């Protein structure tokens, strides 16, 4: 009988944990299930690489002072943090959504100008995803700068919004 009670408790605790994780991700303003799926197999990617729309990358960051930012980040990175610069080819329609596994600032630059975000959602209770930011751009090349990260790696997904 004692084993049955312990087994039931373990099942209920596991179900509660799974529900809590789902509830944490539900707090985002838009779904992040695609990012969660992509992050599990994100390939290691060096700073300076091109990020593909519809994919994720496990981006290697460098000390912020060595990142080679095209423009100074809108939010100055704290001492001892990491950053990177990457490029993306924005598809027709121009809307992209950049989601991150951890805390970092995102700046998008197109035609030499910093582009303000069109939407932001961030939660601390979703496993593996910290923030998701939307931008409305012109089709064509853009630069994405990541700064202020506390770790030297960051999973990044670039998607078209659902």
Protein language model regions, located:
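Generic hydrophobic/packing signal
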Residues: 8-12, 56
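Acidic, Ser/Thr/Pro
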Residues: 21-162
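Bacterial N-terminal signal peptides that target proteins for export
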Residues: 1-8
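N-terminal signal peptide c-region/cleavage motif recognized by signal peptidases
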Residues: 13-20
């Amino acid at each position: 009988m004692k084993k049955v009670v312990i087994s039931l408790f373990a099942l209920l605790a596991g179900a509660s944990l799974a529900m809590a994780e789902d509830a944490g991700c539900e707090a985002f303003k838009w779904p992040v299930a695609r990012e969660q799926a992509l992050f599990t197999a994100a390939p290691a990617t060096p700073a300076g690489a091109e990020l593909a729309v519809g994919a994720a990358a496990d981006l290697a960051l460098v000390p912020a002072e060595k990142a080679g930012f095209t423009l100074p980040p809108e939010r100055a990175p704290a001492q001892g943090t990491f950053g990177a610069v990457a490029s993306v080819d924005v598809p027709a329609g121009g809307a992209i959504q950049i989601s991150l596994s951890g805390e970092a600032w995102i700046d998008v630059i197109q035609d030499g100008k910093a582009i303000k975000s069109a939407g932001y959602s961030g939660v601390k209770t979703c496993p593996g995803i910290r923030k998701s930011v939307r931008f409305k751009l012109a089709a064509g090349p853009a630069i994405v700068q990541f700064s202020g990260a506390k770790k030297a790696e960051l999973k990044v997904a670039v998607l078209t919004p659902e």
